């Protein structure tokens, strides 16, 4: 999500705590997306849809070498629902559904000395994963349920450094950030529910755990952007250390492994002062690749987007479409995603300069 944010329209990155020290005013970024996924297997086909807030960030600076930012961003969204019937040897009907969300709210502060800025981010991460398994025999009026609920939270600390400078013909910036390993605390509940009638229900707890359950892994990120007049090029990548094994009762067991991602994007604006409307648009293209800690396959994606600057303003809006594939041997998934975003830039808290 947000594959072009590293270069597209100069949007700031929540993963880089030092970005606000290089601003020249107040900036608010807002973006959301809608996504449709199609999964294909040799004997089945499924279509799912989802949508969410992608980024909400407010940054400001007084123009004297320091900045402050706050924001909200989703870390992960997942879910599925399956249903099947068996006739032999014992007929029954079963369903299995899983949904999970994880979000992070954060505060950032940054200080700049000449072309170098240092930043710190404090984040609060919370997530909920719920799995519901149901089994119903022909003799049952109501199904039996296996309910699994996992709630996690963590305090996340990130440090970042950002170097930004320019020459007569070029401008460039280089950024690095490191997220520290953090303990994940919360509760895990695994229960069985037997419905004798609409009013008589038996509940049995199979597993309950509370306290420190796992660790949120450390990660490294780096990126570089290069621009000249009407075009801009950006490259970004990240590496995340291996998380712990996913071995809670009620979920599939999975061993964690290290993961990485890389993205490349380019933006071109023919002539910002042209009278023709299409010459004032910002044209974007990008590509993206990612591996996952609990899945063997990789994600390959490409993005196309356009941006438009508001008249007589530094604020911009953009629209992008992304296509991605998860190549696999038995189950293949591909998706379309449409993202819409706005970046408002104003000169609040900055003293006007009179030459």
Give the label of every model feature segment:
Residues 1-74:
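N-terminal, post-signal peptide beta-strand-biased segments of exported outer-membrane/organellar beta-barrel
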Residues 61-355:
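Outer-membrane beta-barrel porins/channels
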């Amino acid at each position: 999500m947000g594959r072009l944010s590293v270069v597209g329209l100069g949007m700031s990155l929540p993963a880089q705590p030092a970005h606000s020290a290089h601003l020249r005013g107040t900036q608010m970024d807002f973006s959301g997306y809608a996504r449709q996924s199609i999964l294909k297997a040799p004997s089945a086909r499924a279509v799912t849809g989802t949508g969410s807030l992608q980024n909400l960030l407010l940054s400001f600076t007084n123009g004297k070498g320091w900045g402050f930012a706050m924001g909200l961003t989703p870390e992960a969204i997942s879910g599925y629902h399956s249903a099947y019937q068996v006739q032999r040897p014992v007929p029954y009907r079963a369903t299995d559904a899983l949904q999970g969300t994880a979000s992070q709210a954060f505060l950032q502060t940054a200080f700049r000395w000449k072309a170098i800025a240092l930043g710190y981010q404090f984040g609060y991460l919370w997530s909920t994963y719920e799995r519901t398994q149901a089994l119903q025999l022909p003799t049952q009026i109501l199904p039996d349920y296996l309910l699994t609920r996992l709630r996690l939270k963590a305090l996340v600390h990130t440090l970042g450094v950002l170097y930004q400078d320019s020459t007569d013909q070029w401008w460039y910036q280089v950024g690095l950030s490191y997220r520290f390993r953090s303990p994940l605390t919360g509760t895990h509940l695994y229960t069985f529910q037997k419905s004798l009638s609409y009013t008589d229900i038996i509940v049995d707890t199979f597993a309950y755990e509370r306290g420190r359950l796992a660790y949120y892994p450390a990660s490294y990120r780096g990126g570089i952007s290069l621009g000249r007049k009407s075009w801009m090029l950006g490259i970004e990548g990240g590496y995340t250390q291996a998380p712990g094994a996913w071995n809670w009762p009620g979920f599939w067991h999975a061993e964690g492994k290290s993961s990485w991602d890389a993205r490349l994007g380019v933006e071109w604006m023919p002539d910002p002062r042209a009278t023709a409307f299409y010459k004032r648009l910002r044209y974007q293209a990008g590509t993206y690749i990612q591996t996952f800690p609990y899945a063997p396959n990789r994600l390959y994606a490409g993005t196309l987007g356009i941006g438009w600057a508001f008249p007589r303003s530094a604020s911009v809006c953009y629209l992008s479409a992304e296509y991605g594939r998860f190549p696999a041997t038995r189950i293949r998934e591909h998706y379309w995603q449409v993202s819409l975003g706005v970046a408002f830039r104003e000169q609040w808290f900055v003293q006007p300069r009179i030459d």
